[in-house]
C-alpha cells in the first residue's frame, strides 16, 4: 500500500485552480481530484474556492450571483468555472477508480453535493472534508454512508481528547483526520494513529516535505492520502520509494 494522491484544486501548480483543465492534468498525472465547492444564487453547485472575487475594481460575492452571471465575468486568469456535475461528466470513464475530495463552503453546499453524488452513484468514490463538526454532523444526518473527513484547525499542535472532540468524531463514524504539513507533522501523524484514525496530509508541495511524508511509518501505518499542487513530482518520488 502507498498513500493516495489528490491533486489540490487539480494540478494547481500547473493549471488554473478548480478548472476542468487542472483536474484533467491531475488525473493524467495519476492523482485524484480535490476541489472546493459552493452554491450560486440560483443553487448551482460550482467548483470555486473563495466566497468572493475581484475583477478590476469590482467586488463580487459568489452566492449573490447566478451561474450565468458568474460565467459572463471576464476573470483575469480567463478561467471557466465548472459545475460539479460537469466535472463528473468529464471523468465518467475514470469513475471506477478515481477518487474525489471536496471542501465545502457551507453545509447546504454539502447537502447539494450529496444529492449529486447519489444521482451519479459515486458515494464510495467521494470524500467530503470540513473543519466544522456541526457541518459534518449535519451531513451525517443526511447520509449514513458518506465518507466524511475532519480537517483540523491549523493552530492545533496535539491530537488528544483535550484538543479535539474525538468521541464525537467516532460517534459520527469519521475515520480520517486531515492535517496540514507543518513542522510537527510527524508527531501529529503518530497521535492520529494512536487514537485509531487514518491520517491525510495537505499542503505537501516541496520535495523535502514530500519525502518526509512518504517516509512516515508508525505502528505499521502510513499516511493514507496526500494533497499536493504537483502530483507528478509526488508520484515520481513515491514510485522510487515504494518500488
Features from the language model and the residues they span:
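Catalytic domains of carbohydrate-active enzymes, especially glycoside hydrolases
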Residues: 22-39, 169-177
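Metal-dependent phosphodiesterase/phospholipase catalytic core, i.e.
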Residues: 49-156, 172-182, 195
Amino acid at each position: 500500500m502507498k498513500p493516495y494522491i489528490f491533486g489540490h484544486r487539480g494540478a494547481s501548480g500547473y493549471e488554473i485552480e478548480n478548472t476542468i483543465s487542472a483536474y484533467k492534468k491531475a488525473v493524467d498525472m495519476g492523482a485524484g481530484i480535490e476541489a472546493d465547492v459552493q452554491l450560486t444564487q440560483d443553487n448551482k453547485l460550482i467548483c470555486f474556492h473563495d466566497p468572493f472575487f475581484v475583477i478590476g475594481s469590482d467586488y463580487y460575492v459568489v452566492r449573490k450571483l447566478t451561474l450565468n452571471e458568474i460565467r459572463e465575468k471576464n476573470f483575469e486568469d480567463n478561467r471557466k468555472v465548472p459545475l460539479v456535475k460537469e466535472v463528473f461528466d468529464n471523468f465518467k470513464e475514470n469513475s471506477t477508480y478515481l477518487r474525489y475530495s471536496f471542501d465545502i463552503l457551507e453545509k447546504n453546499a454539502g447537502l447539494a453535493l450529496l444529492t449529486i453524488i447519489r444521482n451519479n452513484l459515486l458515494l464510495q468514490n467521494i470524500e467530503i472534508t470540513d473543519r466544522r463538526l456541526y457541518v459534518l454532523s449535519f451531513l451525517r444526518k443526511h447520509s449514513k454512508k458518506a465518507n466524511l473527513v475532519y480537517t483540523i484547525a491549523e493552530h492545533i499542535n496535539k491530537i488528544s481528547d483535550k484538543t479535539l472532540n474525538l468521541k464525537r468524531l467516532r460517534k459520527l463514524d469519521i475515520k480520517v483526520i486531515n492535517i496540514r504539513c507543518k513542522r510537527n507533522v510527524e508527531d501529529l501523524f503518530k497521535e492520529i494513529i494512536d487514537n485509531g484514525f487514518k491520517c491525510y496530509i495537505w499542503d505537501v508541495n516541496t520535495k523535502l516535505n514530500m519525502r518526509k511524508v512518504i517516509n512516515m511509518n508508525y505502528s505499521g501505518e502510513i499516511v493514507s492520502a496526500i494533497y499536493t499542487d504537483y502530483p507528478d513530482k509526488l508520484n515520481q518520488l513515491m514510485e522510487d520509494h515504494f518500488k
